[in-house]
Amino acid sequence: MRIILSWFLVFGLILIGHGQTATILSKEGKVPLESVLLHSENPNIQGITNKNGQVDLSPFMSAEKIDIRYLGYKPIIESYLSIKEKKFIIYLEEAGITLDEMVISATRWQESSKGIPSKIRTISKSDMQLLQPQTAADLLGISGEVSVQKSQQGGGSPMIRGFATNRLLYVIDGVRMNTAIFRAGNIQNVISLDPFTIEKAEVIFGPGSVMYGSDAIGGVMNFQTTTPKLAIDKKWVAHSAVNSRYSSANREKTMNGTLHLGSPKFASVTSYSFNRFGDLKMGKYGPDSYLRTFYVDQIENMDKIVQNINPRVQVPSGYYQQNVVQKLLYKPNEKWAFQYGFHYSGTTAYSRYDRLIEVNISGVPISAVWDYGPQIWQMNHITVSHLGKNAFYDGLTLRMAHQYFEESRIDRNFSGSNRYRLRTQVEKVNALSINIDLKKTLKKGILYYGLESVGNKVSSQATAKNIQTEAPILVADRYPQARWNSYAIFGNYQYPFSKKYIAQLGIRYNLFNMEADFSRNLAFFPFAFKTTNIQNGAFSGNAGLVISPDDKTKISLNAATGFRAPNVDDMGKLFDFVSGEVVVPNIDLTAEIAYNGEINLSKLIGNSLKIDLTGYYTYLQNAMVRRATTVEGKDSILYNGKMSKTYSIQNAAFAEIYGFHAGFELDLPLGFYLSSRYNVQIGKEELNNGATTNSRHAAPAFGLSTLGYKKGKIHLQFYSVYSASVSYENLNEEERQKPAIYAIDENGKPYSPSWYTLNMKGMFTVFKSSTLNIGLENLTNQRYRTYSSGIVAPGFNAIIGFFVLI
């Protein structure tokens, strides 16, 4: 019966289309494939299939070579005439394991990974549909190659190759998300992205500054979100989808609805998601020091220490979030495309859990209140694309974007002079960016080049009040009022010496400047300056070589530099990172520079085994680090009601990171498969006295191993995630000062224990257009913290989700 229905579907699709409409199906199940990419160099045009696997081939009538690619399937090359002879029905065969996939991160253009010397990890839509990550931070974690730190449940700060926070770059639909207030401390901006709207995520490891600019030192995380789908027939089509999910560990309730509308030239997609995350429950078996035995609550207008009825429930850690995405596409012909995108993300306030569990020497909580206010991100984004052969380019993409960021911090001490002072610090950033990306195929090789302009306006305001009298209290702003600008020109040339050797060479020059006004804080601190202007520039470059002795072997060598320009957070921030110690502004900063070398080996053995090996070394020069300083000749100032020792961010250190990645994928008979990924990163950074300590953001060795089964309507995975320990002796010097987030060893010293989880996920096609997801995470109910995290990871977690396509 299934075979008969499949063939009825095939013939039905043929009848729906017209003579020049091709239908692309999977060879195994005869299922239509959506978002298959078709590309021709002559004529220079592209096409993409709709949800019925259909694409209009009339623009390809003169094409002798049409490259047809789809993630997870073997690429094929056909001519228009050969497709016509097949009556416009094309079958794609599942690739299983391959060295070739389409990526966009390396050059900002979609291309085959075969000619790219950098290591890139792709997280596909099918991975996300099976594993059901709650947030975009969790999405990165399922890669098995990115370690994620969480200070609180509403968190997620990736660590890649020993770097994190503002030494990593986030890119959404080709637009940089990093702003002038991305800090060296852990950040959680990535949770603003909605996993339901992410079509694909790519992580490029190592410096990516040539194509992406400042901050791309440890890596670049490139997220491609949902796009509108055009219709093939000369009429409007519509379809919608609904996702729902429940998770037991935090009583998550998530709903998503998506609506697609399309005609041959105009299309729209609308998506809305709502997440309700309750207080997170930790596991049963693990260190007792992780238990949440108390919390602070106000009872009759007095702060009270309340005994937690269930110490495994982390109170308070829950929050709500909603996301909206709206995109419009107008494509008048095969050469031009105009797209508008709108993104909105907003959370409720959520507690910074790692601060709420801190106690003083007497065991009394330090904070009564420590919350992040609502985190808001909004982006308006216009993209203009043109395909056409001329003297300057074969392809051009213009991106213009405006982003608005809002974040806040709300804190009050449990005791002392500030126990009644409720302080609120609000930061707002307006970011404008323009990117022009061009691609030109030359007689020998391809040139990728472009221009970038980025501007940030930072507004910072702090207020406080006495909670008993409501009287206002004057407090210092976190940042000066500031502007940060960056202008760049770049180029990257890919030259094939032969089929076996491909070289790549790139260069970028970046000019940046920063203006800051400290007037609002002069009443609090005797700075010797009122305003400041910093201007500097930086070159970056890369050189790579890909060697392919045969179709089943890829060896790549890559050398690259990266840089991070000082931003407003580095230069102008005023905050207390530890009680009694405060960071003050420094107007003499310059860019830090990274030098990286790596070697990658990918090898197919037969048609069923793939091995990946990578080794790398990175040296960071002029690293911006926290160092002791003086203000008006004094080493301490009065801040937050107490005399505090002064520090500033300075170009005063070096750091070095080295490590390796090893992984394999194995196809087994009867639909089974096996894979494993393991990562080791070792880092050193210079201390104030010239000695070194282990790098704060070099996570302990970690990995992911998976046994899966995929056949027909069933996809199952049993997998384990695991991490090595970090002893007190190997713990970063700064991390040693945070005993609240670490376990205690037999000598009474903080350390990070090793841990593992066992997990199961299943996805079942219940009907033709609906799927059921079932998951069981942390089956052995381990109580563990990922490295450097404040929140304890979930204990046993049962997940059920349902997807319906209408």
Question: What are the functions of these language-model segments?
Answer:
Residues 55-58, 177-207:
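Short acidic/polar hinge/loop motifs at secondary-structure boundaries
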Residues 90-91, 192-241:
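A beta-strand signature from Gram-negative outer-membrane beta-barrel systems
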Residues 348, 359, 404-408, 464, ...:
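Surface-exposed extracellular loop regions of Gram-negative outer-membrane beta-barrel proteins
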Residues 3, 331-345, 374-523, 530, ...:
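Face-selective signature of the C-terminal outer-membrane beta-barrel domain
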Residues 425-437, 486-488, 584-590, 596, ...:
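Outer membrane beta-barrel strand-and-loop segments of large Gram-negative receptors
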Residues 498-499, 511-512, 616-619, 639-733, ...:
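Gram-negative outer-membrane beta-barrel transporters
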Residues 250-277, 287-350, 376-378, 497, ...:
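Transmembrane beta-barrel wall of Gram-negative outer-membrane proteins
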Residues 28-29, 36-41, 69-73, 85-129, ...:
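Short, acidic, small-residue-rich periplasmic hinge/interaction motif at the N-terminus
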